[in-house]
Every structure is written in structure tokens, then in C-alpha cells.
Amino acid sequence: MKKISEQKRKHLENLVDDQGIIGALAIDQRGALKRMMGKYKEVTAQEISDFKVLVSRCLTPETSAILLDPEYGLAAAENRAQTSGLLLAYEKTGYDASTPGRLPDSLDVWSVKRLKEAGADACKFLLYYDVDESEAINERKKAYIERIGSECLAEEIPFFLEIVSYDANNSDSASKEYAKVKPHKVIEAMKEFSKDRYNVDVLKVEVPVNMNFVEGFGTESLYSQDEAQAFFNMQSEATQLPFIFLSAGVSATMFQETLKFAKKAGSSFNGVLCGRATWADGVLPFVQQGAEAAVAWLETTGKTNVEELNQVLRESAVSVFEKIQ
């Protein structure tokens, strides 16, 4: 059971629903969103900001919180529903592919103090982590996360650490080869950053298996359903912290089925920060037809995606306050 300050708890209460579950919308994408829009036309920073505003305005009445970035997302933060809490991302988008290690970097003109002043109920930081990479690289990452944990402790707002695992020797995270090692990569990273020294309050993590390689889910079976369920159990046992799942760009249907599978496996996950699975198909009408068409999609299909996800969460996730004092 993790103990947090009264102030941190108040902020955390702003991010959960009435069952203590985090049903949050993630649209802190910057590079990825620019690429999604850029498939159809040249996009401006204003258009990226405008799309985030529409997503926030249309969908936050149905979500417990929204995750945004301070670069393109502050207008969207102001346009969220009053019932929806706010997480702000602290990391720079992407990583320098020319340098080994996918090293973390925070936004130049931001600090946790400034995120809090901008209205954030929590600081989110994305870390790419390969537990089997060199000690020289991983020690730098550990020290970096210690610093952010200390900042969040000083400012008394929750620290959400998003961990995206990878293999330094295999750049294809969708491959069968990576699927074989993914459970080890995800679970060991969670064990490391659950240590008290990092002052992490909530982990945002991947599901421990690539569901496309689970019997009955994908075209090729690498794991039986029993084996996959065992990994979900191992993941829950790897941390005493609340943890939530990221959607990793899969479809809305696949994400919902994955959460049902996690529940069946006995996972004690505490919610989601769901991004592209919710809003990705709204990009095309926005870029090709404008705001009105995007709103029409968001108010129908987008809202349905959120409502269906919320129903699955109510039936499968566990309150964060079962793990926090």
C-alpha cells in the first residue's frame, strides 16, 4: 500500500471516476499526430491545437481526465469538461534515433511547478526502457526519473510514469521476435520503477503480451490463452503501485477485448489512458472536411468508443484507492 500526501490524494481524486477508476483520454501526441495529419496535407501548429480542442470539448464529458501536452494542448485543457481532471506531459516528443539509448528529455521551458501552475492535477513522463540495455544507459534513465519524482514530491502532485519497453537489438516492436521477449521487458521495467526511490504514484504501461500473437486473437499464435493470462498475473504481482494500460495505437475493439481478457486473467489494473483507439478515425474528417465534420464524428463514433470503453472499465478495473493510502 503506497502512502501519499493529502494534496497528492486530492489531485488524484480529480483524475478518477466515482469508482476510483482512471478512465482517461490521452491526446498528448505531438509527432505522431502531426504524422497522422500529414498523410493528407501539410498541417500547421494551429490545426494540431484546434483538433485537440475539439477532442477535449466533445469527449471529456465522458472521461475522468484528459492527458495533454503543454506545446499544443493548453487551449484543449481550457476547453475540457469541469468534471474531467488534467494530466500534462513533461517529456519532449519522440527520441533522437541517431543516439543509442532513446534517452529521456524534458520540455525546455517547463518544470513540474509550471505544469501545476498551468492547472495540471498530475505530471506524466514517458520513458523508453530496455531492462537489458547497458548499465551506462539505464543508470542515466534511473537518475532522470529520480529527479522528476523529487519534483513531483516537492510540488505535491501525482507522478504518472509511462513506460514503453523496447529491445535495443530489434527495432521492430510489432515483430514475432519482440513478442517473445515483451513480457520480460514490460514486467522487469515495472519492477524497477515501482521502487520507493522514484516516487512514482501511478504506472502507465503496456499490456504484457502482444495480443496479435495470443491464441484466438491474432492470425498467428505464439502464446496460448493460459500462458498469456499467466503474464497478466505476473504483471499485477510485479508492482504494489496502481497501474493503468495504454492503448498503443490498437483499434477500439481490440483494446476493449484486451481489457476483458486482462480481467479474466485476474489483472488488478486500475484504468486506462486511452489515446488513438478513441479518436484516431476523427483525424481524416478534420483534415479533409474541417471542424464541423470532425465534431460530427467525435459526437457519434468517438463518444460511442468512450462509452463502450467506460462500460468495460466498470466491469474490469479496480479502484486506485485499493493500492493507495
Swiss-Prot record:
InterPro entries: Aldolase_TIM (IPR013785), DeoC/FbaB/LacD_aldolase (IPR002915), LacD_aldolase (IPR050552), Tag_1.6-dipho_adolase (IPR005927). Signal peptide: none annotated. One of its GO terms (molecular function) is tagatose-6-phosphate kinase activity. Its EC number is 4.1.2.40. It catalyses: D-tagatofuranose 1,6-bisphosphate = D-glyceraldehyde 3-phosphate + dihydroxyacetone phosphate. Keywords: Lactose metabolism, Lyase. GO terms for biological process: 6-sulfoquinovose(1-) catabolic process; D-tagatose 6-phosphate catabolic process; lactose catabolic process via tagatose-6-phosphate. SMART domains: DeoC. Pathway: Carbohydrate metabolism; D-tagatose 6-phosphate degradation; D-glyceraldehyde 3-phosphate and glycerone phosphate from D-tagatose 6-phosphate: step 2/2. It holds the Pfam family DeoC. The keyword DNA-binding does not apply. Belongs to the aldolase LacD family. This is Tagatose 1,6-diphosphate aldolase 1. It comes from Enterococcus faecalis (strain ATCC 700802 / V583).
